[in-house]
Amino acid sequence: MHLRNVPTCPEILGEAALANEPDIKQVFITGFTETETADRKLYLIRKRIENKVRLSAIPTRNDFYVVSLSTKSIIYKGMLSSLQLRNYYPDLTNSYFTSGLALVHSRFSTNTFPTWGLAQPFRLLAHNGEINTIRGNRGWMEARESVLSTPVSYTHLRAHETL
């Protein structure tokens, strides 16, 4: 495992973004032999970390957010315009880093106060509209949990349980 401080250029941020700029780290975990198994393990690791932080006495626990922990993607996000992104993250202009795909989403929230954690993209989606019914969507999914299935059988994957 390697922990990396992500290089940033905070001087390009606006006043609100700078006042709330998070500490940005990247974790690289090696030793996996199969991508599918690695993704499952990384998911469980992420959930365990999130639950431990959520249940801790850390004063900034409500601001903690794992942007990505995946074999497939690295996400760079912030309270930034798309033009600011490459200037804020020098990695994005470093020729050492290559990518087969880049997705930039720059729409700002219209009915919630902007925060780093709510900035686009999220781990699994970027969208062009507000998702106003998160509570409703969670309730809908929880009501159908008993009919959901996966070929991988482990019952401890419920996101709201402590791992």
Question: Model features per residue range: what roles?
Answer:
Residues F122-W140:
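Conserved phosphate/anionic-ligand binding catalytic regions in large, soluble enzymes, centered on
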